[in-house]
């Protein structure tokens, strides 16, 4: 599996700072993988938002991760649904994909499987992603902004969790 004990440029901010010093910074962008961000102890949606703000998010690889162990490449959204929602929310709210960017699914089968079930991790990741896109599009954005303005983050969290639960 991919080594995780050497991070020369540990965050998107560090990377973009270093990239700005190159001969042609316009040729440099970020590909953010959810699991690698989680392995670094960071939040993928924060890293994506930072790169988007700087117009440097060129691609994402969505997957999930249990925590600080090896790179698991689990199906997107199966470990932390709220974290997955936050990633989709950031991408959707910023129109990601409308200018030629693409979203990849960097996932793998959990164990040796039969041929018939060997691609279910891709199907599951895609289904979860598309369902989260629908949920992002149906969340009451005005209420989200009202709660942010009121700094009522507990109510905002509950509202989003209830939306994810379908209530």
Regions from the PLM with identified roles:
Residues 5-167:
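Histidine-acidic metal/acid-base catalytic patches
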């Amino acid at each position: 599996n991919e080594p995780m004990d050497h991070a020369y440029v540990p965050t998107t901010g560090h990377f973009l700072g270093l990239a700005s010093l190159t001969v042609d910074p316009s040729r440099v962008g970020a590909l953010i993988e959810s699991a690698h961000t989680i392995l670094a102890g960071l939040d993928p949606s924060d890293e994506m938002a930072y790169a988007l703000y700087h117009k440097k998010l060129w691609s994402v690889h969505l997957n999930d991760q249990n925590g600080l162990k090896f790179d698991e490449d689990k199906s997107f959204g199966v470990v932390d649904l709220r974290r997955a929602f936050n990633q989709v929310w950031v991408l959707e709210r910023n129109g990601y994909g409308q200018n030629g960017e693409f979203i990849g699914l960097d996932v793998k089968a959990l164990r040796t499987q039969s041929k018939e079930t060997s691609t279910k991790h891709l199907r599951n990741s895609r289904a979860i992603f598309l369902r989260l896109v629908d949920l992002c599009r149906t969340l009451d954005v005005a209420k989200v902004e009202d709660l942010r303005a009121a700094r009522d983050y507990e109510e905002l969290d509950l509202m989003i969790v209830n939306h994810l639960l379908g209530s």
